[in-house]
């Protein structure tokens, strides 16, 4: 072999093999790498990813553990907790095993929560994100419009998630997004719309790819889009989407399908409470076809394979919500009063009165804080000025019903009723 021929032979800069000893030699700036070294590098990276995923899996709580942790923050809704625990566990188990070579590809299972206002839909989603320590964002479906119209683009949802994790794209890819009021973007009829529906069917169409999995182009640091801008590329394939809505009157669609109640002279006359219980039972029988009749397009329903329902909270559940969870309202107000050196005691009849009022207002658990806040407004206004010598404040049903003032107990004194200055 001549010296000129030797000079023309290229060698891998890593293993030293010549171009004749390997299948492919890739050239770079003054450097060459063979296909064997590339395969070796890929194997090393894959092994590290599997090791990291394995470590993350060890920390992933099992469905019963997720259920128990949900119990610490959310009262009732046992069936919904069970469904969510399994769904979330499978979702993150799937993410942890994506690096393994397998012919079976597991699809993402997004979730639809159906339940009345104040039943705990948002709280369940928030608590799941807290348990799993993943980024979490909430979006309101009623503010979304198609791109190019006044309102929020659907891609703004991803931007909110990025903001929650300081624009760490890799972290955002494993987050949870909760879209509230999803029932409000239902079209008015179950036939395709002939006119432009920018906040209903149009939004459903825009959400399809985002929920299923696409690469969204997001302006960095919340800026507006313009042609010369560099975008952050966010793959939504591994983001878990949980949609929630009240779906008012959905039970009527299910009732017509199941044909449980007669009409006209054949109709059974029942009290209002029975109809409420009947509606709750019917909602549990929700099928994809019922949601399509309600106004969700079939493609959108197909992207939400896991459907679970939440029950309307009764008086007992609302009373437990006031006292039992880790961040219960009563515990929060006790802490607030402790800052002033005063103890506050809510009697059981007061808790019952608060729960009854929330049921009357049809606000569920969401309305509990506003009722307590309104009740204690005057007391909290005057408390800093009268806290000296005050040991305890007792709240009973009379205070909630505004029939009597709180009971003040001073140091070295028996209980006495005092009216807060107004």
Curated annotation (Swiss-Prot):
Binding residue positions for ATP:
116-123
Is this entry keyworded Chaperone? yes
Residues where Zn(2+) binds: 12, 15, 34, 37
Q: Which UniProt keywords apply?
A: ATP-binding, Chaperone, Metal-binding, Nucleotide-binding, Zinc
Q: Would you tell me the Gene Ontology cellular component terms?
A: HslUV protease complex
Single GO MF descriptor:
ATP-dependent protein folding chaperone
Q: Which domain of life is it from?
A: Bacteria
Q: Which GO terms describe its biological process?
A: cell division; proteolysis involved in protein catabolic process
The ClpX-type ZB domain covers which part of the protein? 1-53
Q: List the disulfide bonds.
A: none
Q: Pfam families annotated for this entry?
A: AAA_2, ClpB_D2-small, zf-C4_ClpX
- What family does this chain come from, according to its entry? Belongs to the ClpX chaperone family.
Q: What does this protein do?
A: ATP-dependent specificity component of the Clp protease. It directs the protease to specific substrates. Can perform chaperone functions in the absence of ClpP.
Spell out the subunit comment. Component of the ClpX-ClpP complex. Forms a hexameric ring that, in the presence of ATP, binds to fourteen ClpP subunits assembled into a disk-like structure with a central cavity, resembling the structure of eukaryotic proteasomes.
Q: Give the protein's recorded name.
A: ATP-dependent Clp protease ATP-binding subunit ClpX
Q: Which organism is it from?
A: Coxiella burnetii (strain Dugway 5J108-111)
């Amino acid at each position: 072999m001549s010296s000129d021929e030797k000079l023309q032979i290229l060698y891998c800069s890593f293993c030293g093999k010549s171009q004749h000893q390997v299948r492919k030699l890739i050239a770079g700036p003054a450097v060459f790498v063979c296909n064997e070294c590339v395969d070796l590098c890929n194997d090393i990276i894959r092994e590290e990813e599997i090791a990291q995923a394995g470590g993350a899996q060890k920390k992933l709580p099992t469905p019963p553990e997720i259920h128990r942790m949900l119990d610490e923050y959310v009262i009732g809704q046992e069936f919904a907790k069970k469904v969510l625990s399994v769904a979330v566990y499978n979702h993150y188990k799937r993410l942890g095993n994506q690096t393994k070579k397998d012919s079976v590809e597991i699809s993402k299972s997004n979730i639809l929560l159906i339940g009345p206002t104040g039943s705990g839909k948002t709280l369940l989603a928030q608590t799941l994100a807290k348990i799993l320590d993943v980024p979490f964002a909430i979006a309101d479906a009623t503010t979304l419009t198609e791109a190019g119209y006044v309102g929020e683009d659907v891609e703004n949802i991803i931007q909110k998630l990025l903001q929650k994790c300081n624009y760490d794209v890799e972290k955002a890819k494993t987050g949870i997004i909760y879209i509230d009021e999803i029932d409000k973007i239902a079209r008015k009829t179950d036939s395709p719309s002939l006119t432009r529906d920018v906040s209903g069917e149009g939004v459903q169409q825009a959400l399809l790819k985002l929920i299923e999995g696409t690469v969204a182009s997001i302006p960095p640091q919340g800026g507006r889009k313009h042609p010369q801008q560099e975008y952050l590329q966010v793959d939504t394939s591994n983001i878990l989407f949980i949609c929630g809505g009240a779906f008012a009157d959905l039970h009527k669609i299910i009732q017509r399908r199941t044909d449980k109640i007669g009409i006209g002279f054949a109709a059974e006359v029942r009290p209002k409470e029975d109809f409420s219980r009947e509606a709750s039972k019917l909602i549990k029988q929700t099928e994809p076809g019922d949601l399509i009749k309600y106004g969700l397009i079939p493609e959108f329903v197909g992207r939400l394979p896991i459907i679970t329902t939440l029950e309307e909270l009764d008086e007992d559940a609302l009373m437990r919500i006031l006292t039992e969870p880790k961040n219960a309202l009563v515990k929060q107000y006790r802490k607030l009063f402790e800052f002033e050196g005063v103890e506050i005691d809510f009697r059981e009849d007061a808790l019952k009165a608060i729960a009854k009022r929330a049921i009357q207002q049809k606000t569920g658990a969401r309305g509990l804080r506003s009722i307590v806040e309104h009740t204690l407004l005057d007391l909290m206004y005057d408390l800093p000025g009268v806290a000296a010598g005050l040991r305890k404040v007792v709240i009973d049903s009379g205070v909630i019903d505004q029939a009597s003032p709180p009971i003040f107990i001073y140091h070295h004194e028996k209980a006495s009723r005092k009216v807060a200055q107004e």
